[in-house]
Amino acid sequence: KPNGAFLSGNYLEYNVMPYGGLLNYGWLDKNLSLAGRILIKKKNTWNSKIIDFQKTVAVVPSVAIHQNDKANSNLDLNMQTDLQPVFFLSEKTSDWIDFLKKELKLTTETIGDYELFLYDNSKPELFGKKDEFLLSPRIDNLTSVCAALESFLESSSENIQVFCSF
């Protein structure tokens, strides 16, 4: 959301919007990173840059069980009040742009606009007695794209074929 930074106490948070099917509780207490596109102006020239922080920069904290006695029986999460990520301690919302500039090592450049996405930056890993299980964020999307692409590549159709993945 444009100008989405806000303060909750001394926490700088950012209004977010869901994309696609969202399993709300799955975002709680995860190490979240930020990636997307940012528009940067340097010497009167605007350039678009793809960015990926590749480290934890935010968390959507859950409430402790003693503060919500219905957490195990009725977890009803509101996108606008319960799922806002916390980025850092701050006293002013303008620190958001300063944060982006510092992380991207920008000095004199101006940040114009951006479209950023939070993602779970946990690393995939195998587990089980014989490492028979794979635990990975985004595995449902990755496997479906892989299966579709393999089918596309192995197809022997003489017709025009198109494969799109977003």
State where each predicted segment sits.
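N-terminal hydrophobic/helix-forming segments and targeting peptides
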Residues: 1-166
